[in-house]
Amino acid sequence: LNGKKVVSKKVEGSLVDIDHLTPDADFMKTFATQFEQGKKFTNDLVGKSQNTMESVPAFFGPSAFIDFIHQMQLQIGKAEVSFAAPLAMDAVIPEGNIYVRDMFNLYRYENLLYVMNLTGQEIKDYLEYSYSGWVKQMENKDDHMLLFRDNPEQYADAWQRFQRPSYNFDSAAGIRYTVDLTKPTGQRITILSMADGQPFSLTRTYRCALNSYRGNGGGGLLTQGAHIPESELTKRIIWSTEKDLRYYLMQEIKKQGTINPKPLNQWKFIPEDWAATARQKDEPLVK
């Protein structure tokens, strides 16, 4: 304060443990009906899965977890290429019954699904930017593979160990490509073909499925990576869902009844022996 005038201020927040507190009885009584309705909804059966889906493997290559989302996005959006990232560090959806509550592990945020027009060059640049924040340039097979902060072991929570948020680690489906861990940023991605073996062209325009956070510029993959001006992003959108993506994922699972999620194996890190060795070192730091 300078007299009665505020000249500067600083606000800090922190998480507070409230487990030891007793909930207010009037509050609990007032909202008891809504609480029971919400609990019933999250316990509703959506379908069944023949395999366990985990998010941790997604940091090291194709995974059933992310590739199921890719498959759904390609199908729902009638797209040629899909982009998706692990939205949770340690999500697990066990084999067996899938309930509504599990869908919040599979897809945490209230994003719409967009389909946007991107050129082949923009797709490559998008992926270069994604992996630039995901993996480091390895000098030998004993290096870390993931782009951690210095001394990652000092951080208690796995998400704090990364230099960039893991929800910006987009991989792609619909195309076959490699990510060279020995190359610098901008030279890592080699797109071999479309997933069906058809040629991939840097000059052709493709229908690309991605969530609305990403499509509106979130994470910078479109603006800083693909070099699309923010003012142009809305012009690239050619289709959008009306409801959140989780709703459509639920509808697809209900429609199929039983799903069998497996990795699509459309991309990989190379050299493969370096990636395998680095995974043994890095995976404990992701859990």
Task: Give residue ranges: language-model regions.
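Catalytic centers of hydrolytic enzymes
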Residues: 1-287
